[in-house]
From Swiss-Prot:
Cysteine disulfide links: C716-C743, C731-C745
Bias kind Polar residues: ranges: 259-269, 287-309, 1464-1475
Chief localisation class: membrane
Biased composition (Acidic residues): 1485-1498, 1508-1521
Topological domains, Cytoplasmic: 796-808, 857-882, 949-975, 1025-1693
Protein name per UniProt: Latrophilin Cirl
Family: Belongs to the G-protein coupled receptor 2 family. LN-TM7 subfamily.
Organism expressing this protein natively: Drosophila pseudoobscura pseudoobscura (Fruit fly)
InterPro entries per record: GAIN_B (IPR057244), GAIN_dom_N (IPR032471), GAIN_dom_sf (IPR046338), GPCR_2-like_7TM (IPR017981), GPCR_2_extracell_dom_sf (IPR036445), GPCR_2_secretin-like (IPR000832), GPS (IPR000203), Lectin_gal-bd_dom (IPR000922)
UniProt-annotated site: Cleavage, residues: L748, T749
Gene behind the chain: Cirl
Amino acid sequence: MVLQGAKQRLCSSKNLDTCVLTPKYQTAYACEGKKLTIECEQGELINLIRANYGRFSITICNDHGNVEWSVNCMFPKSLTVLNSRCAHKNSCSVLAATSMFGDPCPGTHKYLEAHYQCVSAAQTSTTTNRPSPPPWVLNNGPPIFGNGSGLIHPTNIGGGSGGASAPPRLPTLPGVVGINGNGGMFNVPPPATHATPPGSTATLPGGRLKGVATSTTTTKHPAGRRDGLPPPPQLHHHHNHHTDETTPTKPSGKVPAASNATAPSNTRILTGVGGGGTDDGTLLTTKSSPNRTPGTAASGPSVSSNGSAVRTINNINLNAAGMAGADDETKLFCGPTHARNLFWNMTRVGDVNVQPCPGGAAGIAKWRCVLMKRMPDSSFDEDDEEMAGTSTTTPMSTSGDCLHNSSSCEPPVTMAHKVNQRLRNFEPTWHPLTPDLTQCRSLWLNNLEMRVNQRDSSLISIANDMSEVTSSKTLYGGDMLVTTKIIQTVSEKMLHDKETFPDQRQREAMIMELLHCVVKTGSNLLDESQLSSWLDLNPEDQMRVATSLLTGLEYNAFLLADTIIRERSVVQKVKNILLSVRVLETKTIQSSVVFPDSDQWPISSDRIELPRAALIENSEGGLVRIVFAAFDRLESILKPSYDHFDLKSSRSYVRNTAILTNDSDASAGDLQQRLRILNSKVISASLGKGRHIQLSQPITLTLKHLKTENVTNPTCVFWNYIDHAWSANGCSLESTNRTHSVCSCNHLTNFAILMDVVDEHQHSLFTMFDGNMRIFIYISIAICVVFIVIALLTLKLFNGVFVKSARTSIYINIYICLLAIELLFLLGIEQTETSIFCGFITVFLHCAILSGTSWFCYEAFHSYSTLTSDELLLEVDQTPKVNCYYLLSYGLSLSVVAISLVINPSTYTQNDYCVLMEANAVFYATFVAPVLIFFMAAIGYTFLSWIIMCRKSRTGLKTKEHTRLATVRFDIRCSFVFFLLLSAVWCSAYFYLRGAKMDEDVTGIYGYNFICFNTLLGLYIFVFHCIQNEKIRREYRKYVRQHAWLPKCLRCSKTSISSGIVAGGGTGLGGTNAGTLCSVSTAKKSKLPLGTNDDAHDEQQQQQHMSATEDAIMGASSDCELNEAQQRRTLKSGLITGTLQPSQSLGGHVVLERGNTLRSTGHASPTSSAGSTHLIFAHKQQQQQPPLGEAYYHQPDYYSWKQTAGGMKAQREYYNNAGAATSSPQQAHEVFYWTQKPNSQHGKKKRGGVGAIPASPSGSLHSRATAASQVLFYPSYKKTKPGQQAHPHYAEALDPPQPPNTAAYYQQQQQLRQQRQQQQQQLSSDEEQAEQHAHLLHLQHQQQQQQQRRAGGQQQLPAPPPHMAQYQQEFMQRQYRNKHSNCDLGDAYYNQGSVGGADGGPVYEEILSNRNSDAQHYEVGDFDVDEVYNNSVGTGVFNNMRAAVAAGGSRYGGSLSGGSVSSRNQQQQQHSLAQPISARRCTADEDDDEDEDDEETTAAEQLHDGVCDEEEEDEESDMEDDSHGLPPQSAERMRRLMALQDEDFKRRFQRQQRKHGAPVDYGTLPPGSAQAVIGGAHPEHNGAVFGVSGGVGEGSMRGALRQQHAKSPSARLAVNELFGHGNTGPPLPPANQTPAQKRQQLQKLSPQSTTSSSSHTSHSNPHSHPPHHQQRHLSAMLDENNTVRCYLEPLAK
């Protein structure tokens, strides 16, 4: 090692501006065979003062304490040799060997010693003061201490008590640092109030020594120091201007005290006790820079500081250049103290103080100074803090550029600050609690050891002397080793000497006497008076000595047992040992042998029982030789090993040792450590044959607990002679109580009970939390638990929103496991180890964590299997797979925990906290390994899923697959983030628990990381698994409004039901452009055309679009009203324009989102409920009657607009006065969904027609037996008529005068309404409900035709059929299911009539199932529109479509039907030419049975049946052909679905007509059907659209566009073509009209024009376009859940 020379600057106190630079004196050593390296700073040269190769001290380079070497060994030419190598050089290196210097004293291990100075090159010619020679050269006087030590303190050289003997330099242990000398060592004398203690030497690791300084600066001793130690000096640094205030005072000696202080910058907790090994031979050389050592005043010893030393503590280099101030330096030295009759001087942290053994003993004693964590009752009191605050030390610059003429020198403070912070919580402590006197041996025992090794020595005499010495003399650590060695030697020699005694009795007597002496000696060693002797040994030596004592006693006992040849029992009882030697004849052994007897050993109630069979099988010659022993106080020696502690923390050892010394203050700490103590006396048993062999039958031990309070977890153990430690192998705990434990062992040796100590002052894991962290942990766990519960309730309450899928089941189980983990953790951290719930909590927490990780793995696997199988296109219940997940998850977890319990149940109870298993092999095998396997599998499957998604994204997929792929991609992303958060939470919790146990500095960081990550985990679950789902958001709002127990402010929330406003014309509410879509994506790219308009646009249509932007939804009830402006939603996409939208845009109906999916920005109907959406359609307006004002369907003024033009103004003004202005922005549009189930893969099933209703209650829509084209919703229709007001607070506006001819009908409706309120929810199934509604429409069709004829007044219509009264009676007796809206809309809401007929006509409400399933794709080839158009002349579109299907062979099962748009006159004219084809479809068996009673079977029905049969046969081929078609188009799908739906209802309506004897008129359709024709006197107007059916015939937009634009047959059918408005489009539900539009209608639809219009239409060309009429736009989309949505245009005012 290198020592860097330093110049010591001594400044005069009289002249602060002048400094005299004095080179610093240094000493370096190198053991024989090693190199001595000397190095000075740049610009400085080596100036040698003296040198010697030989030996002047017995301690330097003497690790083994050899005292026979000569200490007067000197090579005279040593200085000459060194000068030739090092003089006037900056650095040099010299080998300390006889080849270089010669051998002045053969047989003595020598060392090279050099005294030198580092002087600047300019001062090499100046004269320097030669310091005094080393003290061991000048002083040879008698000792000054009465303990026989011939040492004096080196500061007393040259004066005081005459000549003093030189202090021997003693070796130290490897890996430790000496305490004195230059370059970072202290040698501080005590205050003048007491005698100067022996000197302390400066040793380096492995006995290597540091240089000794002889500076003479003194500092003031501050008041308040309890230990009487001088504080480190203040260092004032000025750039090139150093002011050192010194006041020389006289210390206790006549020569100024020599001292030098250096504060280390970085240390760590030291734990090694004692030491061993050999010197590594390296010499530690310290580089030192110049420094100042100012004193403050008055008197006191001197402490100088070396501000930039490079030191090594425990083989760790410490850079002291950035050291902290004096407040830290006071904590870097252990104070002087007296221990074991020795005075231990102040010692630097990391150094080992070495000195000769006390008087009467030979050898050396050592004691180390280490840093330890402060205890709560830290000795760093206010006085220390005040002292630390008044003195600061700033590091010196190491460059040497700060000359005394300069102004200032700024010191670096960064490192000092860091060191200051690190050392603030530590304090210097002597370690271990007592000095290490392992090498100290008494002269008496040394004499006995020499005697026992002599050939003719008397063993009995030696044993007697040994027992006397051990009982009367003070022993040291080395004496314990010698004594046990003598015991074993005596027994070995007696084994050979006993043969010299021919007489058996004499032989037994001699051995018995020897045994008595040995037992007495052992008892003396165990006596309390010799406890300090045991503590002189390090823990390893203590275990070795104890093992040697036990084996020596046992060996001597069996020496006697082998000598006895007959049955006999010998008992040796002394103070601390009871020894029993029994020789038994096997024939006399009748039962088990018990030791000890109750009267033999009153000290303890322990007993050991040997079974008879084990004794007999270990007999020899018919005799069984047994040795029993019971020990007192041995339990305080044989301490358990602390291998489960981190040995880097010395506090663990200090606490454990404190139990041995009953030092409660030393054991009090701020961290609950798990301590294992020996909680019973030690009892021993051995058999002669094999002694420690395995037994066929186990022995039974009953051991009494020494401590009954605050102990737990008893463990039966035996002492392993080989490992010198306690082991539990072969022993088990049979039973235990508060005072005793019963053990069973299958071998013999020394037994005891180990138990855990529980700190009575600290009860749980929370005791180590500070106040803030404890609160934060409670808050974090509470937040996470609340959000997990919300997620679970969401999946349960709103399960109708989702298809029951494997992913949903997986997440439910993940949430359950996480909830269990959070709750168990919260309970576990509050439990103590003594709690009965501690083990149970750990077991269940283990199981919950394993289950949670396994579900994460299965979630990743499920995503992977979804991408690699057909599940990508199917999201249905997967019960078999989920059942496998359940079995593997919970079954595997429980199995692992059960195995862990079987292997080692104590794993769950032996840890410090009740939330963590003990870190052993079982823990790593059953906890860490499975968790890592599951996590790695989850990461692997996630990685594979990403690869597959990347591949699929580059291939051409159908729209449905792209949508599903986007959903899976989003799920995988969310799951991966979820996985990362959960891993962070668990890792932070684990490292926090482990770090808190070891008291690591980063423990707090882990704790707060756990708090943050756990809170984020709860928020993530709620946001990304609940809030991000649009359906769940909608269901939350519905749920809030449907429950009366919630606060009214929540149920009447003004937040929009959906996520935006559907507005036309590109404007939203309030005149803003919120509804405008700004995307440049074309409809072609989006694959979902939104709409188009005809080339001709009249002023009326434009006004309608402008007024539609001002509409708003209003949902009202008796207690709340949604009549305010809806919240705007920022649209992130734009208006989708393209070739299909040539002139006008539909406005802000749809938003384009990721994955090329569209989402609505409109509103859902306020009558929607969970799992369904209500769509309300009105009867078509009869435009030739006096125009009736259209009302908003959700407003209470519906009937106020149904008056004539003359009375409309007054009533509108009346309504306006009620508070709702006509100019307020209001709109009403409807939303409905539909989906379709994919092809069934479960074999060929008998399919019903489209819309067939399953037999299960409420329609089991997900049966796998359904057809490929099965529509997954079954509409329910509610026929309502105008009646009482729906809103009492608008009673005047809602009670219009009723026509006189409808009084009887209204009376019937009043009775019917009362029945509805009393008999709700009575229909057993959707099948019954659908049949009921079909019957109602048939009845209403008949009644409405009569009313229209009477209202027209131009012709007399025939009276209603005779069975009309019967229909009305049945109509009143029917029971209906009443659907309430979110705001409790009553029946009156459904009684709001439409504008048809004199009484307004019925309003039909369609309830569509909102199931999350995949829709069936339809291709263009399914509908040959050209053929349909060519065959549609003079026929209804339904008949033409039936013919087209029959001719073309539909692939998808179920017939097609477009909405008929021809007038009634056209249908009547063409009826005779058309082939009547029944509108029946392939129905279920129950539907066919109902039709068997029908007497009429038309040709159309036969044709239809043939088509169904053909479809049944070609099912599988159709499924194959489907994969080769063109990419799907949402418009085709929508057209097909609605056509099938309309046809299904039409079939039911016609069946009702046939059942009641009415003629089946395929041109006369129900008023709710798309083909329904309500003409009468107004034949040119079409009926209202029921559902929204698209037509492909003459009157359809599709046919018109075919004719006008001549599109190719392969062109796709767009949504805007199917649902757009225009001259040829099918009529949609009517839109409200502006006052200007209504006046125009009054002029156009006058009675005169009505006749001419009727006549003209009756004879018009079939190909001519019908006149303009008010229609409403309909836009469609496919949302992220693969559900088709349609939005009707808002009603214009």
